């Protein structure tokens, strides 16, 4: 994929390896809004507007370096898709969501977002995140650990967190940005165990944090959609831990990429 970095934007040549709709609407990030001819996305106090232009796409931002990493532009997704296309079950999902890329989002933002995501839908998750931003800093950016920790359980209930309010309140007292960064050096099994030890984080949420925050490809988050997919392609099975392990064994280090193509396809059909 070819792209050019300028002072205030990235220009991406027309390609099958980048599509903002595929990327932003496949459940890996929630702080974005659809605008005319594109999307506005926020991450770690940075913002960008992605628009379609004659030659491809433009990412307009004051922090070009951040969004080059955020959209994982240096990774060869054509090569990843070629490897996954060896599996017949991946042909239609990759054709449908060919422009997906795995985002490199902020660790703390990812953790909080996916605690909020448990048994929730994307529109409601977005409303909660935007309400937290407004409450903590007037909507300027995703709240810092310090800003969120200053909120009471009642404050968290007030923005719509429901039963997740006391869970997030406790998690904020178990870990902060520095601790999450320290865990980068752990292998995926040890890191998952650390995450699951935190309040409000089960296996599926932990795997989402591993994939979208830590960039670990050797995980396969399993939710209702992926459970249905597994039963359709393989065998009736309700043990999501076993489903995840079977799919990681199958796809190896590309399991996380396979999950995103399959999730986007399954949810849309």
Task: Give the residues covered by each predicted segment.
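HhH-family (HhH-GPD) DNA N-glycosylase catalytic core used in base-excision repair
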Residues: 1-269
């Amino acid at each position: 994929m070819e792209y050019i970095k300028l002072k205030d934007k990235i220009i991406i040549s027309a390609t099958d390896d980048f599509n903002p709709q595929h990327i932003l609407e496949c459940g890996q990030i929630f702080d974005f809004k659809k605008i005319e001819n594109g999307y506005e996305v926020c991450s770690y106090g940075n913002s960008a507007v992605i628009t379609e232009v004659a030659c491809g796409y433009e990412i307009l931002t004051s922090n070009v370096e951040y969004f080059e990493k955020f959209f994982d532009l240096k990774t060869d997704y054509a090569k990843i898709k070629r490897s996954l296309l060896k599996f017949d079950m991946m042909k239609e999902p990759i054709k449908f969501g060919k422009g997906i890329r795995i985002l490199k989002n902020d660790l703390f933002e990812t953790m909080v977002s996916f605690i909020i995501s448990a048994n929730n839908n994307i529109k409601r998750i977005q409303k909660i995140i935007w309400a937290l931003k407004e409450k903590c800093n007037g909507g300027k950016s995703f709240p810092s650990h310090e800003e969120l920790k200053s909120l009471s359980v009642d404050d968290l209930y007030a923005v719509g967190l429901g039963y997740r309010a006391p869970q997030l309140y406790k998690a904020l007292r178990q870990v902060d940005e520095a601790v999450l960064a320290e865990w980068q050096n752990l292998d995926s099994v040890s890191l998952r165990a650390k995450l699951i030890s935190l309040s409000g984080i089960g296996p599926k949420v932990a795997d989402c944090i591993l994939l979208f925050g830590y960039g670990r490809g050797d995980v396969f988050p399993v939710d209702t959609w992926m459970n249905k997919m597994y039963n359709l392609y393989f065998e009736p099975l309700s043990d999501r831990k076993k489903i995840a392990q079977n799919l990681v064994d199958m796809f190896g280090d590309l399991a996380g990429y396979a999950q995103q193509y399959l999730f986007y396809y399954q949810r849309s059909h």
